[in-house]
Amino acid sequence: QDIAKNLLEQTNLNNQNYLFLISLEKSLSYFADEVFEKVQSGDHEAITNFSCKVKWKSLANNPAIQNIIIPEITHGGVIDCIHSYQMLLIAPKRDDLISSDSSIDLKKLNELLDRSYRWISLLRKNLDEC
């Protein structure tokens, strides 16, 4: 009974973390739509139906903002971290491992949120100046 309770509590925590990551990804997706409206002319194909990562890859082709976007869609960037954390939450847990540093804790999620906030602020400032 205690084992089942622990599993359920762990599942709830994973669900909360996963919902947080989905919310952050959705927020960045809507922000990508906003950026697209500001930087692209009307003759380009709309990106609203694309996934978050594909939207940002498409926006990275714009020379005015590519230096800000490319580091965040490549390895170690905000978009990549969101995807990596989602994969960690979905992956089955291995009980045969004694320790692992791949767990997702509140500190990592808070750092991800701070990084995404700084990235959005920098991009907004850049777009306002151009």
Describe these PLM feature segments.
Residues 1-5, 18, 56-64, 81, ...:
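Intrinsically disordered, low-complexity linear regions
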Residues 1-16, 129:
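Charged alpha-helical initiation segments
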Residues 3-7, 23, 30, 119:
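Amphipathic, well-ordered alpha-helical segments in soluble domains
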Residues 12-15, 19, 104, 111:
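A structural signal for alpha-helical segments
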Residues 16-37:
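Short, hydrophobic, well-ordered secondary-structure elements
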Residues 32-52:
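Short acidic alpha-helical/loop segments enriched in Asp/Glu that coordinate divalent cations
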Residues 42, 51-115:
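Long, charged low-complexity segments
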Residues 111-130:
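Glycine-rich, aromatic-bearing surface loops/beta-hairpins
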